[in-house]
């Protein structure tokens, strides 16, 4: 009994790191362009980097989705499309945008240091075409991050309250590190974790996360124009 308990812990701990290894695999080409693309410059370099990255990303997505499917991570996904669940997700997404808008505006008014995620995004755009960055943040990030920080962490911890706290803090910290921008990512993480915590349906948090990431560059400037709030 005790042995099975610790084997289960080891299984999900290993799975957490495996999912992130697969998730970050395509970023090798972004992290070391001077090694892989040393002889290329300008547009030619960007084209080659983009195709290599897309190839690696396709492999990563296939492996990640396959692993999660085999482990039953996507069970009850169809239930998302019930009217009451769609309405809940729509309202939650709107709330998420509003919370992010105010926390992000406050952060920009008082701090200038970018977080890890923002720095990585700015760097990657210099190497591959912008549409690749969009695919990464709107599709890859939600699939891998939600699987790791929601279902895997909830499977690792027997106590749901501990799992909730670790999921919220861990997700936010992964994006920011020891940085004041944590005040932006922590509320976002709490909302996404709460979505998963409600029914334990991974597809719901993936959907909201993906829509949020995809529309963020449009919604935030729009809210700034509508409210007139650029600083808090």
From Swiss-Prot:
GO terms for molecular function: endopeptidase activity. One of its GO terms (biological process) is CAAX-box protein maturation. One of its GO terms (cellular component) is plasma membrane. Its main location: membrane. It comes from the Bacteria. It is found in: Cell membrane. The chain crosses the membrane at residues 12-32, 47-67, 86-106, 124-144, 165-185, 206-226. It is a multi-pass membrane protein. Keywords: Cell membrane, Membrane, Plasmid, Transmembrane, Transmembrane helix. The keyword Transmembrane helix applies. The keyword Cell inner membrane does not apply. Belongs to the UPF0177 family. This is UPF0177 protein in abiGi 5'region.
